[in-house]
């Protein structure tokens, strides 16, 4: 089992009242950047790099980054820059980017070059994930949401061809046209770095991933919904002649460890002011999913799954309707002493059977000191236990068995 560490890298130096007074009471897209203090931001970026360096020391297999725009809920607006820093200051763990929002790139060749440089600088440690991005990303970059999926798939095809086909060649697509494709920066890994796709349950993306044999990582999805989505992937995989295993699936869960359950529960409340934003104020629906962004498919499996996602009380409005105790009781977040965390994770791993576990260790108002203690306990007690559980349950990862 592949164990990687993640944090959203949220900025929380603002108030709920600030959000309510913003256009449409939104913490993303229209929340003014006048609330951002670059002095605080400078400290945060450097603290996050310190934590990622310590994560390597504690034995994580991978360091995961993500990207969002026009929001304080994630400071990763230029994730590839952060990845380049990690490529130089770390030596062993994979650098997992989940992921670059392909539809907003007008020049996918430039992206292919950036990622190739990161792969070379890290000496072949890049895992390149791609995403469609939220509606906010499309609106923030003036990208027509109607063509989001088309641009995602075409940009993906162009990046892969750029990595694998000697140039020069010409590209004449619907959304991208280049007379000469011939970058000298190509990845160290052959034929190209591994591609993983994260998401929260787009059925079309699940099918597309299975067609490409790409691992799909479920981002904090409910347990029943995750199993249903795995079945959509599995049905497609069988149609393409293979049976998916744990190496085709990953799962992201917030996991915070302290010396006692009481301490962990107290500290873990800091998550509530992380990627959901201070005040947990719901994002307007037309920001998250603008007209044209969603699918028009009438496949009954897809319709049923979409309804299940919409009715998930922990998803609607970004966890705004769920009390902290409810979240813990549902095991959507795993927070406690090492023994408590190991016990609960055994249950989750037995049920979900992912070959990749993304561990969201801290965010929001969780202090740097508490974050470092969490990572220390992870390295000393939790990660060794998880490796034993992974072997016992035969949770093969993509580096043990190619997807």
Where are these regions (language model features)?
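N-terminal beta1-alpha1-beta2 module of alpha/beta enzyme domains
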Residues: 1-90, 193, 396-403
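Alpha-helix-loop-beta-strand connector modules within alpha/beta enzyme cores
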Residues: 76-97, 378-387
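An alpha-helical appendage that flanks or caps ligand/catalytic pockets
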Residues: 7-36, 149-184, 225-354, 387-403
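Glycine-rich, proline-tolerant flexible connector loops at the mouths of alpha/beta enzymes
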Residues: 62-85, 101-102, 220-221, 359-371
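Acidic (Asp/Glu)-rich catalytic clusters
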Residues: 56-57, 83-92, 115, 119-126, ...
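Active-site mouth loops of central-metabolism enzymes
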Residues: 31-46, 99-109, 191-200, 255-258, ...
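Short, well-ordered coil/turn segments that N-cap beta-strands
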Residues: 1-4, 60-62, 90-95, 121-127, ...
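Conserved, mostly hydrophobic/aromatic
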Residues: 55, 67, 86, 118, ...
């Amino acid at each position: 089992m592949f164990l990687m560490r993640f944090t959203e890298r949220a900025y929380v130096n603002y108030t709920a009242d600030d959000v309510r007074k913003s256009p449409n009471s939104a913490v993303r897209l229209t929340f003014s950047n006048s609330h951002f203090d670059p002095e605080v931001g400078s400290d945060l970026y450097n603290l996050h790099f310190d934590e990622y360096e310590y994560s390597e020391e504690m034995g994580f297999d991978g360091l995961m980054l993500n990207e969002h725009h026009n929001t304080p809920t994630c400071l990763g607006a230029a994730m590839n820059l952060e990845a380049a820093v990690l490529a130089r200051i770390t030596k062993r763990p994979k650098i997992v980017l989940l992921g670059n929002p392909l539809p907003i790139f007008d020049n996918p060749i430039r992206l292919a070059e950036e990622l190739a440089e990161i792969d070379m600088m890290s000496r072949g440690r890049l895992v390149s994930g791609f995403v469609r991005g939220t509606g906010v990303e499309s609106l923030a970059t003036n990208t027509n949401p109607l063509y989001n999926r088309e641009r995602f798939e075409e940009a993906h095809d162009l990046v892969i061809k750029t990595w694998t086909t000697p140039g020069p060649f010409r590209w004449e697509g619907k959304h991208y046209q280049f007379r000469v494709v011939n970058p000298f920066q190509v990845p160290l890994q052959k034929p190209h770095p591994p591609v993983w796709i994260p998401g929260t349950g787009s059925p079309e993306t699940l099918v597309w991933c299975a067609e490409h044999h790409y691992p799909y990582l479920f981002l904090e999805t409910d347990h029943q919904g995750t199993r249903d989505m795995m079945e959509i992937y599995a049905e497609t995989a069988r149609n393409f002649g293979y049976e998916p295993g744990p190496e085709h699936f990953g799962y992201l869960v917030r996991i915070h460890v302290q010396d006692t359950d009481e301490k962990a529960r107290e500290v873990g409340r800091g998550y509530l002011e992380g990627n959901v934003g201070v005040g947990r104020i719901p994002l307007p629906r037309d920001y998250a999913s603008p007209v044209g962004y969603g699918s028009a498919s009438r496949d009954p499996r897809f319709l049923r799954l979409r309804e299940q996602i919409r009715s998930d009380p922990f998803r609607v409005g970004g966890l705004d309707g769920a009390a902290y105790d409810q979240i813990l009781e549902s095991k959507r977040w795993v927070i406690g002493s090492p023994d408590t965390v190991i016990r609960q994770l055994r249950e989750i791993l037995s049920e979900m059977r992912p070959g990749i576990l993304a561990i969201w260790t801290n965010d929001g108002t969780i202090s740097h000191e508490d974050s470092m203690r969490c990572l220390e306990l992870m390295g000393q007690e939790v990660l060794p236990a998880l490796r034993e559980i992974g072997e016992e349950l035969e949770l093969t990862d993509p580096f043990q068995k190619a997807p």
